[in-house]
């Protein structure tokens, strides 16, 4: 059975989260489309909050 690709917005959120955990700035968002960019930034913000709470070093 073939695996379905996750939708673009879900991938953007995940990549934004990974960027936030690794300490990258939100200005490094690679997306131009507003809906996808907002998902990336949402993931980035979530990661920053998790880092501040001490979930990641």
Swiss-Prot record:
Residues 1-14 have a biased composition (Basic residues). Residues 1-24 are annotated as: Disordered. InterPro entries: Ribosome_modulation_factor (IPR007040), RMF_sf (IPR023200). It is found in: Cytoplasm. Keywords: Cytoplasm, Translation regulation. One of its GO terms (biological process) is regulation of translation. One of its GO terms (cellular component) is cytoplasm. During stationary phase, converts 70S ribosomes to an inactive dimeric form (100S ribosomes). Belongs to the ribosome modulation factor family. This is Ribosome modulation factor 1. It comes from Colwellia psychrerythraea (strain 34H / ATCC BAA-681) (Vibrio psychroerythus). The gene is rmf1.
């Amino acid at each position: 059975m073939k695996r379905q690709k996750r939708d673009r917005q879900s991938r953007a959120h995940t990549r934004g989260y990974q960027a936030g955990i690794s300490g990258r700035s939100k200005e490094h968002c690679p997306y131009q489309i507003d809906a996808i960019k907002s998902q990336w930034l949402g993931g980035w913000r979530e990661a920053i909050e998790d880092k501040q709470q001490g979930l990641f070093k």
